[in-house]
């Protein structure tokens, strides 16, 4: 039902793409369902594995969609010096990614179209939908 509404609507569909299995599977499923993906947004961590460039090129080649790469204005090592190592409980690293991606998405032109950001995560990560940054993305 949701997919059919998206197909008819005037939406800008943005896939937040980490290059991992969950976001890759989500992108594949959206395209197979006929959802028009307008942007694939990739946050460069500055510490990416060398193989990630090959994976991004493969995804672009297979989907025909260019991948938009965004970066935080402050170098990762500067953040590390200020705040210490990121924590799995959701420290500054997640906030850094969120702010950067959200700034890009809000800056997209699109007339009156709504923007939907798709974020792929596994079923055991459902708690992520209740975090403050996720609620901020939904305008609540």
Residue ranges of predicted features:
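ATP-dependent adenylation/nucleotidyltransferase module used to activate substrates
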Residues: 1-140
